[in-house]
UniProtKB/Swiss-Prot annotation:
This protein's UniProt keywords: Cytoplasm, Fatty acid biosynthesis, Fatty acid metabolism, Lipid biosynthesis, Lipid metabolism, Magnesium, Metal-binding, Transferase
GO biological process: fatty acid biosynthetic process
Highest taxon of source: Bacteria
Gene giving rise to this polypeptide: acpS
Keyword Lipid metabolism among record annotations: yes
Protein name, entry field: Holo-[acyl-carrier-protein] synthase
Amino acid sequence: MILGIGSDTIDIRRVQEVIERHGARFIDRIFTEAEQAKAERRAKAPRAWVATYAKRFAAKEACAKALGTGIRQGVWWRDMGVVNLPGGRPTMQLTGGALVRLESLLPPGHEARIDLTITDDWPTAQAFVIISALPRG
C-alpha cells in the first residue's frame, strides 16, 4: 500500500551558487557523511560533484513531501540520506524525526519500503520517492 509520493526538481546551478556562497557550512548542515563521501569521489569533475549534491537535495525534498511534512514538524535535512542497497538501487535512510514520522504512518504489522529514483541532465536534477507499507513476513 502506498503511504506517500513526493517529487522534486531543482536547478543544479542554484545548488552550485549556494555551495559557492556558504561552502562547508551548507554541505555539513544538509548532507550526511555518506552523501558527502559519495560527492567527494566525484570532486575531479566539478559538474558531476555539484550534480551529486543537487540530486540528493532533490531526494530529501521529495522524501519530505512523501512523508507529508516537508522540512518541518521535526523532520530535518540530515534525518534523510540517500544510500545505495547492495545491488546499487538508491533508497532513503531515515533517522531522527523523519524515522519517527515514517513509523507513525505504518499500519500495524507492516514495514516500510522507500523507492527512490534520482537523475540529472544539466542544469536540472530530479528525484521521485514512493513510500510503501509492506506486510511483515
